[in-house]
Amino acid sequence: MRDFIYRVIIPPQAIDMHGHMNNVYYFTLMQEAAFAHSAAVGDTVEAQYKRGEIWLIRKNEAKDIKSAKLMDKIEIYTYTQAEGKATSCRYFEFKKDGELIATGKTEFVYIDLKTNRPKAIPAEIIALYS
């Protein structure tokens, strides 16, 4: 597994009535970081549909440790790890100036589009993220 780093500046639409980043926005950033990482290794949504296999989210979680604010520069470190035959987890660490401010985890299931059922993750897909 190798880390991928996604960088973002917290925009105005992410800020809640308390003046810090809304916790729901973590999921938006997790999705953006995941898509960027997948694109970087060649596992785009288009590539998934072409081979007839996709990733679907089973569970999403985030833990806020320290609030992010408007215009904060955040680095999101993410990596994947196979957790079973047809499941993989993506882990996230949100950092500001090197300090951990949040963590996240997304559990994915690998789905065969023909059967709409879970399928064992092919070795070549695991290798893309290793």
List PLM regions with ranges.
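Residue-level recognition of specific faces of alpha-helices
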Residues: Y26-L29, Y91, E107
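A structural microfeature
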Residues: A102-G104, A120
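Hydrophobic beta-strand-centered segment that forms part of the acyl-chain substrate-binding groove
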Residues: H37-S88, I101-A102, V109
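Core beta-strand residues in small-molecule sensory/regulatory alpha/beta domains
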Residues: E93-K95
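Hot-dog-fold acyl-thioester-processing enzymes
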Residues: M1-R58, D112-S130
